[in-house]
Amino acid sequence: MQISKLLYLTRALITLIIMPSFAFCSNNKQNKQVENYRTITETFVADVDISLTATPSEVQLFEGRKTAIYTYKSELIKGESSSLQEISNSYLGPIIRVKPQQKIRVRFNNELPDESIIHWHGLHVPHEMDGHPISVIKNGEQFIYEFVVDNRSGTYWFHPHPHGQTGAQVYNGLAGLFIVEDDRNDLPIKEYEVPLVIQDRRFDSSNQLVYLENNMMDRMIGFLGDEIIINGASDSSMEVKKGTYRFRVLNGSNSRIYKIAWSDGANLTIIGNDGGLISRPVDKPYIMVSPGERIEVWRDFSSEETNQQISLNSLTFDSGTMMGMMGGRRRGGMMRGGRTGGMTQGRGVMDDESNLSDSYIDNGEALTLYNFIVSDQEGEVVPLPTEFESIEQFDLSKVVNQNKPRQFDFHFQRMEWLINGKTFEMTEVAEWEKVKLNTTELWEFINSGSGRGRMSNMMKMPHPVHIHGLQFQIIERDVSQVSQSVWNSMKDGFIDEGWQDTFLLLPDMRVTVALRFEDFTGIFIYHCHNLEHEDMGMMRNYEVVE
């Protein structure tokens, strides 16, 4: 049989299997929705009170027709004016700025045609406030969040979490930064503190977003776009003064992984990650950032030449993706931010027998993310601190399962992305997913890539792993079984210190993390943060019990 025919038949078979089950995941009534139409708690006196409304809208990203998007419209009801920062000409939601231990109320209104709910990525909140898919609200309904900011200062974010629709809603624009501010006076502030939300998108000739164009392939592999969008806007560059900057970087893409580096060969100076500042600055030639992860980067432009352009790039790497009979992805060239530099070369086109086209660029291709143009203006220059606050490490002698970590195997089987052989069920919690309050455990995550059967054995992909409700410490990355080509292409790009809530699990890698379950009982979730994998069911509940 010709290769093209074999590939076409394989794709058709997968489509028949996946699509009905995916639709079932989106619409089934197994969730038995809890009562979530809450009223304001009169005894909860909020320091910051915000209204967020998810609604369809339009934004002028490019010349010509406006782009239809979803966005969070916001209103500050109570709090300092700096608590809510809008981004002009952007589809992204506002930046919410708070301080540790402040009481926060968010009145979430849904004006979307589909159900939705907000997850506060990285925040330590009660399970009712976490944005579990069971709490989704319909069009015209409201959910009121009330919680205390019980996190270190750092860069967090919020996004929708309805099962089966998370990928689509985030892709269409629903996301925003949630910054817990510090009171340090030795770091760049105001105009020198710059958010960079990195996302990849596809647009048609009418400037409209295209999602799951290659329906089955995009779901199986995860959506990959052909244009980079920074901060939800079309600008591909910004002017910087001759001063020092603090960049808060979020990988807000659905599935794309970035190997971030400076174009001039300078080291990346990393000062923070998911859980805020690390103990001291670390210099890296590049840093790996998977979907959902955050890093904080320090850069001094004070000695650069006027009009010099320095770019933030993503370097090439081997992701270890193996798709078996489904075939690999066609390799393209450089993708640049903005329409005029969009990638148009290297797109694979199937023959007439399949009538399928491939318009994507592999994970691991070289990309230009954003350009910085050094102006002739002198800016504020702040010396780089030699250290920040120390981070208390878990006492592993007090871990309750020190000699037998819980194991979670992320793999492909029966045409599904699974965890320990199971898919997501709205209320199910297996016995091996129940943990005791006020205990510390070790969890070992394994990317075996495959379950049973020949097709499964050929399916390998990296998975960004996210755990709700807490932050953890990475204890070990076992790379002994990881392909040498894969590991050598990114081995210098990991910072496994400090507090994290998301990490990259490469094919054949094992990662052990230490977690402490405190303050709250209830059901939380853990999942692959490749949003298409998550929507397909690569997500499970865990329950904290007394």
PLM regions with names:
Residues 148-154, 300-306, 516-522:
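Short, surface-exposed loop/turn segments at beta-strand-coil junctions that are enriched for proline
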Residues 28-300, 320, 327-411, 493-497, ...:
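Histidine-centered copper-binding motifs that mark active-site loops
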Residues 21-24:
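C-terminal motif of bacterial Sec signal peptides marking the signal peptidase cleavage site
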Residues 18-19, 521:
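Residue-level signal for mature regions of secreted extracellular proteins and peptides
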Residues 113-116, 257-259, 307, 453, ...:
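Short acidic/proline- and small/hydrophobic-mixed sequence motifs that coincide with surface turns
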Residues 29, 61-67, 73-79, 122, ...:
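Active-site pocket scaffolds in enzymes
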Residues 156-162, 307-319, 524-528:
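Short, aromatic- and glycine-rich surface loops/edge beta-strands on solvent-exposed regions
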Residues 2-12:
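Bacterial N-terminal signal peptides that target proteins for export
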